[in-house]
From Swiss-Prot:
Keyword set, alphabetical order: Chaperone, Disease variant, Mitochondrion, Transit peptide
Domain of life: Eukaryota
GO cellular component annotations of the record: cytosol; mitochondrial matrix; mitochondrion; nucleolus
Effect upon mutating residue 78 to R: In PPGL2; abolishes interaction with SDHA and flavination of SDHA
Keyword Chaperone: yes
Location of the transit peptide in the chain: 1-29
Family statement drawn from the similarity comment of this UniProt entry: Belongs to the SDHAF2 family.
Entry function: Plays an essential role in the assembly of succinate dehydrogenase (SDH), an enzyme complex (also referred to as respiratory complex II) that is a component of both the tricarboxylic acid (TCA) cycle and the mitochondrial electron transport chain, and which couples the oxidation of succinate to fumarate with the reduction of ubiquinone (coenzyme Q) to ubiquinol. Required for flavinylation (covalent attachment of FAD) of the flavoprotein subunit SDHA of the SDH catalytic dimer.
Reported disease: Pheochromocytoma/paraganglioma syndrome 2: A form of pheochromocytoma/paraganglioma syndrome, a tumor predisposition syndrome characterized by the development of neuroendocrine tumors, usually in adulthood. Pheochromocytomas are catecholamine-producing tumors that arise from chromaffin cells in the adrenal medulla. Paragangliomas develop from sympathetic paraganglia in the thorax, abdomen, and pelvis, as well as from parasympathetic paraganglia in the head and neck. PPGL2 inheritance is autosomal dominant.
Subcellular location: Mitochondrion matrix
Name under which the protein is recorded: Succinate dehydrogenase assembly factor 2, mitochondrial
Subunit note: Interacts with SDHA within the SDH catalytic dimer.
Length: 166
């Protein structure tokens, strides 16, 4: 009986010492990515901001190259919600966009550092910054409403790229 008491007491002390050693580290270290221009408030001084290079418009690529790049970037987002939303949007609208609209779409999907921002703006959960309030954002918001009640469970297959125009 005395041996089991010693082991349970020492186990408890070890667990408490681990907790007291790790809990300050866990409570201080947290990561958050900020939208460009945001900075941590006084209460967020312990957060780490990961600086990203500023977005720059690519002026040296052809329209077809830009369309292909934007199609790829619309499909490979890193979060499923935007992969589905943006890839289906790209399938429906990318081929018909003007050069100006392609540039606006490029800025929209590549300038924000947080993909959730794009999703919240498209679904109107949060207001978009003034710089992104344009005709492409209006198209994306309208598309996100899914007025035709289409089933959107995955990104589209790429066969449509090889179909001949009708």
């Amino acid at each position: 009986m005395a041996v089991s008491t010693v082991f349970s007491t020492s186990s408890l002390m070890l667990a408490l010492s681990r907790h007291s050693l790790l809990s300050p580290l866990l409570s201080v270290t947290s990561f958050r990515r900020f939208y460009r221009g945001d900075s941590p408030t006084d209460s967020q001084k312990d957060m780490i901001e990961i600086p990203l290079p500023p977005w720059q418009e690519r002026t040296d690529e052809s329209i077809e190259t830009k369309r292909a790049r934007l199609l790829y970037e619309s499909r490979k987002r890193g979060m499923l919600e935007n992969c589905i939303l943006l890839s289906l949007f790209a399938k429906e609208h990318l081929q018909h966009m003007t050069e100006k609209q392609l540039n606006l779409y490029d800025r929209l999907i590549n300038e924000p550092s947080n993909d959730w921002d794009i999703y919240y703006w498209a679904t109107e959960a949060k207001p978009a910054p003034e710089i992104f309030e344009n005709e492409v954002m209006a198209l994306l918001r309208d598309f996100a409403k899914n007025k035709n009640k289409e089933q959107r469970l995955r990104a589209p297959d790429l066969e449509y790229l090889f179909e001949k125009p009708r």
